[in-house]
């Protein structure tokens, strides 16, 4: 920290999460506090909630601001969908719920698997993220086998065609324990699909008033939400339309403009 504090180049740090393990360790928290105060000219949070939680943990850090993460919304809005038979080997009448995320405990993909076990056989879950031998993925796969829904759970691993996969899906969702500002939620909404997410920090702020929120780990509530989206076409369209409008607020150009304006304040012309 001492060496970095003498660096003549202004340093800017971006905080991407509302929670991390270092904050729970008093030694690491104090070290981080020194670094934030001594080394950085500005600390940028990727969302308002990330700014709020950062300020609660490091109240002495005053050089803060928030610049929302953003995505190329047009890329997702204009993507060409696959046929479900082509992508997953299932009928076009099947109702597909997709989550794009690494397989980590905090992502809680198991909640979606549990919800599938409480829904008709026409409901399928599609997971994008992580390698085939990933430990977290294997645990979720085992859960699907235990609940006898493995034929309705599709693991697509790492993909470069996520926009097309989202366009093929009926609902996009995120079942995380917490997020910073979830890009997956914005991408899902930009695809023009209803977005369903846990009512937690980092998701609530983006989804509330547009998509649908459910209680963390509550697979019963999730199953009811998915059933309603499947059976009520007017409700489905209303949520889809609201999500498209919400996604437009997080277009990547807005993020670029925010960072450019910030950097220009520290550039000596």
Language model segments and positions:
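A short helix/loop element that forms part of the nucleotide-sugar donor recognition site in Leloir-type
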Residues: 76-90, 142, 235
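A short, active-site helix/loop in glycosyltransferases that binds the activated sugar's phosphate group
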Residues: 40-65, 71-75
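Short, structured helix-loop element that forms part of the nucleotide-activated donor/catalytic region
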Residues: 126-150, 235
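Short hydrophobic beta-strand element within catalytic cores of glycosyltransferases
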Residues: 194-197
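Conserved acidic donor-binding segment of nucleotide-sugar-dependent glycosyltransferases
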Residues: 212-219, 228-233, 248
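Aromatic "clamp/platform" in nucleotide-sugar-dependent glycosyltransferases that forms part
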Residues: 158, 177
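A conserved mid-protein helix/loop that constitutes part of the nucleotide-sugar donor-binding site
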Residues: 95, 99-118, 135-139, 220-221, ...
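Nucleotide-sugar donor phosphate/pyrophosphate-binding loop at the beta->alpha transition
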Residues: 9-10, 19-40, 52, 58
